[in-house]
Amino acid sequence: MVESALVDWSRLQFALTAGYHWIFVPLTLGLAVVMATMETIYVINGDEFWKKTAKFWMKLFAINFAVGIATGIILEFEFGTNWSNYSWFVGDIFGAPLAIEGIFAFFMEATFFAVMFFGWEKVGKRFHLASTWFTGIGAAISAVWILVANSWMQHPVGMEFNPDTVRHEMVDFWALVLNPVAVSKFFHSWFSGWMTGAIFVIGISCWYLLRGRERRFALSSIRVASIVGIVGTLLVMFSGDSSAVHVSKYQPMKLAAAEGLEEGGTRAPFSIVPGVEVPGVLSILATHDLDGYVPGINNILDGYTTPEGDVYLSAEEKMERGKTAIEAFGTYRTLKQSDPEAAQEARAVLDENIDYFGYGYIDSREELVPNVPLVYWAFRIMVGFGGLLLCLMFVVLWAERRKRLENMRWLQWASLLSIPLVYIAGQAGWIVAEAGRQPWVIEGLLPTKAAVSSVSVGAVQTTFFLFVAIFTLFLAIEIRILIKAIKEGPKTEIE
């Protein structure tokens, strides 16, 4: 039996390293779009001001990009150190997108990044502009493959279980890539990066206005960033709608936890906060139908039948079928040499129950319910801060276009102080995605407690605190370098 402390510390360590890494990723994705847009303006109109503006944000991009790479490398090693059972069980599938990301996307980023950062006076304007855009595209492609891998864990497709190797093996690469969960998750994450980059640029630009510096630079940056951010946030909402439908279909327990919905039904209400609900809205979000059926936590545990006649087994039935699958697997492995005919009979039983294999490791129905308060409030923080920041960007853009922003110091302060909010919203979104699918590391196939390595709790605790120190140092170094670069400024003023 795996120690619960080992599972908890392994999860905590991965949450720590992934959370730190995600501080840098969305800014890379979003700042790439903002600075590429600025350089495009420079290439079109030839105004050196826009070149200097783009170069300044490019400097901040480079700092963030470098630290993001350093924090990301550690994550991949953790699969082998803390999650070796997981790596063996699905390495054939999970490793493919990670390998593609490392070989193709990273080298694409590195190549064009070098041209972008060092090639201003060495290549033509249009070639340099293309390099800037391709750096951003390369970063987005990196995100594609990472999110394809993550989405497969949320909704496993394109594979089959091989009892001879005790591994899930890929049988359809394109099913993996075009997984509907992966498509919506990529766009949701990418566009949230636009939002992060925009809020960062707006906040820093407002700092210059508060200091009475770099007036034209600040206002021009705010204009571009606000447009990018508004477009990105609206697209985040659109892709989030798509994600809600997929979560409702493939991970109903996650949706029920995010809404604190104990008893489901048709015209299910959307919970704003506990005790404040809007009737029917959850059904619309989850099924695009006011009369759509949304199961609650108890319905999922007890088993339910949809109005369309689809039958879903109870937790106990799934656990029983899972134990049957595990027993048949053991019988097949034992008899495949001595009694091939009996082994094939066991294989048939295994194949019949393989979809519930992971449930055989679950000891009680309570294990199937994630941390409801954590998921519930994380979802509200994500949505609430996202809506607040969208309103802020609309107001900032309106004030800038009306030439009122310079006199609205309260709005400048609000913009500067909003920078932490966009990061909190992003982290909250990942809490919903990852905590909401517990107890599974692979939905329905492999519970988290069966995925950990056979290492001591002390070893994981030691590396956890070591990573806390290292990652905090990375973050402190980046913040210090960013502050120094920001204080130096873009030096675009000629007034």
What are these model-derived regions, one by one?
Residues A149, G229-T324:
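Aromatic-rich transmembrane-lumenal/periplasmic boundary elements in polytopic membrane proteins
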Residues F113-K122, F127-G136, V144-M153, F173, ...:
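Internal alpha-helical transmembrane segments
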Residues M1-G19, G46-T53, F77-A99, S151-F187, ...:
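Membrane-interface interhelical loops and short amphipathic "cap" helices
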Residues E367-W430, Q461-A485:
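C-terminal substrate/ligand-recognition segments
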Residues N64-F134, S151, A435-Q438:
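Membrane-interface helix-loop-helix modules in multi-pass inner-membrane proteins
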Residues A15, P180-G193, V278-F385, F464:
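Individual transmembrane alpha-helix segments
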Residues N45-A66, F89-G95, A99, G119-I137, ...:
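Membrane-interfacial loop-to-helix junctions in multi-pass inner-membrane proteins
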Residues A62-T71, W133-M153, G229-G240, Y332-L335, ...:
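Hydrophobic alpha-helical membrane-insertion segments
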